[in-house]
Amino acid sequence: MSQIPRNLDYLHRRRIVYRRDPLDPPDIDTPHYMFYENGTYQAYDLFKGNAKINTYKSLKWHLLVLWYLNPKLDPDDFNGLAEFIVDKSNGFTTFSISKTSLERIIHDVYMSDLDRPPTNRLRKVVFKMGSGLDKHEKLSIVGRLIGRSKRIHSDDIYQCMIDMNDMGKKITIR
């Protein structure tokens, strides 16, 4: 993985929005986090971790989110932002991209519907910026709120077997 630090100062100086808390009202709101019982797709927090953009698809998604979060951004400024992000020496990507490929991606971003937010993963716990919690404390909170409800228990398997039997399906072990 590339060890070049990200040049976030460029985004800050140009007042580019690259993170936004969800607009949905949370079920639980504390000074440290927001909890959504059914989850939210509206939490955008680009460039938070150490991971870099390493595919064209990821680059296109990042540019789409930046375009969505900055609707008043001039197209020329957006082109400059895209060129800055794809410059490997600025620490955002792990690969170089040709000018024509970048122009094609930018064109696709321009043609996208901004009335629909970009696809995002479902998040149930969103930690507030500057919460002061370290990674271990955050994991503890998530474990306490969500728990291990996604694990399969023997009762679940037994109920599934009963349901399959009621439907007349053959039950096999593989």
Q: Model-found features: residue ranges?
A:
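Flexible coil/turn residues that form the inter-helical turn or adjacent wing/linker of helix-turn-helix
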Residues: 167-169
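Modules that initiate DNA replication and primer synthesis
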Residues: 2-165
